[in-house]
Amino acid sequence: MTSSPVSRVVYNGKRNSSHRSPPNSSEIFTPAHEENVRFIYEAWQGVERDLRSQMSGSERGLVEEYVEKVPNPSLKTFRPIDLSDLKRRNTQDAKKS
């Protein structure tokens, strides 16, 4: 049995202007956490923008798909998880205790 290669989108671009999510009174985030979230959000928005440009034919080579030549055998049974669902379950468990 052969396993299919793992593919990832690699972003090769610049960071955009700052974006702030609305505050949630039940959660307190450190400035470092907010900066990390902002960086990831901005980088992903850039990937999506560049991918749309590339797909419309106006730009080429901005977004590349990375495919591992030899997949890591320890990731063979890896199953992605929905982080929102995990957070929701953890919050519900905390409220029960």
UniProtKB/Swiss-Prot annotation:
It is found in: Nucleus; Cytoplasm, Stress granule. The modification Phosphotyrosine is found at Y41. Belongs to the MCRIP family. It comes from Bos taurus (Bovine). The modification Phosphothreonine is found at T30. The gene is MCRIP1. This is Mapk-regulated corepressor-interacting protein 1. Its main location: nucleus. GO terms for biological process: regulation of epithelial to mesenchymal transition.
